Amino acid sequence: MTLKIGVVGAGGRMGRQLIQAVNNTEGVELGSAFERKGSSLVGADAGELAGIGHLGVTVTDDLASQLNHFDLLIDFTRPEGTLEHIAFCVAHNKKMVIGTTGFDDAGKQAIKSASEEISIVFASNYSVGVNLVFKLLEKAAKVMGDYYDIEVIEAHHRHKVDAPSGTALSMGEHIAKTLGRDLKTHGVFAREGITGERKRDEIGFATIRAGDVVGEHSVWFADEGERIEIAHKASSRMTFANGAVRAAKWLQTKQNGLFDMTDVLDLNNL
């Protein structure tokens, strides 16, 4: 049975890539495409918007009008909008793949609560490579974490609105969990002025926002005499879009529950 997918934020950078990825993937089809109310893109053909030709799917700002046209919603927008979409999907039993970042604790709890009713994949990054990096970081932290200084460095385009990136925070969380630390107390997100000597148990973060950088992350494990770097560089958003569609296909058989890309890729068995 073909999975019908709705894409929120269809006119954005990720939205257009998602439309392309859905169109290029067997077993799924684009059922609906959505934009915010008042957008000049409402009424456009989603395929033409994504640069792949006419698809016959008209961009709309009304989820309710498309109830029969999508089984699953992919959402890479902003927290306030995503939370509204979650409430809609719970009310109408629609599955979700969420790539939005920047949620506060209350937002994350809302996602967890919604997953008791519907199935959700919620991940900070849908790249297969990044999720493999998460596993590598756990292994590196287990061996070196108590003896090496750990720093997470990330760079994104000038339009990104949250910092550090959700991926950088996830990297820190994977490391902290492995070491039995709480990232909220051990994470250092800014250094300025006379900071004093670095504490060994800190997990530092540095953020760069410039130009059109798609996404770059590097984690340093540094000691006197050597430094190990585990890095990932994305050259196209298509890697995230393909991962999100892969997650959507995997989620098709799940009735409810909260999952991430570790589940989708079966990385717990590595």
From Swiss-Prot:
Entry annotated with the keyword Cytoplasm: yes
Record pathway: Amino-acid biosynthesis; L-lysine biosynthesis via DAP pathway; (S)-tetrahydrodipicolinate from L-aspartate: step 4/4
Active site residues per record: 156, 160
GO molecular function terms attached to this record: 4-hydroxy-tetrahydrodipicolinate reductase; NAD binding; NADP binding; oxidoreductase activity, acting on CH or CH2 groups, NAD or NADP as acceptor
Subcellular location: Cytoplasm
Classification via Gene3D superfamilies: Dihydrodipicolinate Reductase, domain 2, NAD(P)-binding Rossmann-like Domain
Family annotation (Pfam families): DapB_C (PF05173), DapB_N (PF01113)
NCBIfam families reported for this sequence: dapB
Entry function: Catalyzes the conversion of 4-hydroxy-tetrahydrodipicolinate (HTPA) to tetrahydrodipicolinate.
Protein name: 4-hydroxy-tetrahydrodipicolinate reductase
Annotated source species: Glaesserella parasuis serovar 5 (strain SH0165) (Haemophilus parasuis)
Lineage: Bacteria, Pseudomonadati, Pseudomonadota, Gammaproteobacteria, Pasteurellales
